[in-house]
Amino acid sequence: MKFSLATIALAAAVVASPTNPPTEAGSCNVKGKTGNVTCCNSAIPILGQLLCNVLASGTCNSGQSAYCCDTGGNTGLIVVQAVNCVELL
């Protein structure tokens, strides 16, 4: 039981660890700094803006809006620092 919990915790930590941004991901300029283009779910009022995924496929899914986010060097599957984002028109 302890081994299973340790394995699950380790796997969760590896999945959530920061990674290099995908090579096909767009870059943008926000507040004078280079940022990443991210897609946020606009259908979920608060949580959708806080949990955004880095744009990897070139387009956002339906119900998502494109944002330019200053990730501050923290890139991964989920960008929690959506406070530093500007919506792209």
From Swiss-Prot:
Deletion phenotype: Stimulates conidial germination and virulence via insect hemocoel colonization. Does not affect radial growth and multiple stress responses.
Claim: Electron transport is one of the keywords in the record: no
Positions annotated with a glycan in the UniProt record: 36
Keyword Signal applies: yes
Keyword terms of this UniProt record: Cell wall, Cytoplasmic vesicle, Disulfide bond, Glycoprotein, Secreted, Signal, Vacuole
Cell location: Secreted; Secreted, Cell wall; Vacuole; Cytoplasmic vesicle
Cystine bridges: 28-68, 39-60, 40-52, 69-85
Induction: Under normal conditions on SDAY medium (Sabouraud dextrose agar plus 1% yeast extract), hyd1D is increasingly up-regulated during the period of incubation. Hyd1A is the most active at transcription level under normal culture conditions, followed by hyd1B, hyd1E, hyd2A and hyd2C in order.
Superkingdom to which the source organism belongs: Eukaryota
Signal peptide location: 1-16
Family: Belongs to the fungal hydrophobin family.
Function of the protein: Aerial growth, conidiation, and dispersal of filamentous fungi in the environment rely upon a capability of their secreting small amphipathic proteins called hydrophobins (HPBs) with low sequence identity. Class I can self-assemble into an outermost layer of rodlet bundles on aerial cell surfaces, conferring cellular hydrophobicity that supports fungal growth, development and dispersal; whereas Class II form highly ordered films at water-air interfaces through intermolecular interactions but contribute nothing to the rodlet structure.
Name listed for the protein in its UniProt record: Class I hydrophobin D
Organism: Beauveria bassiana (strain ARSEF 2860)
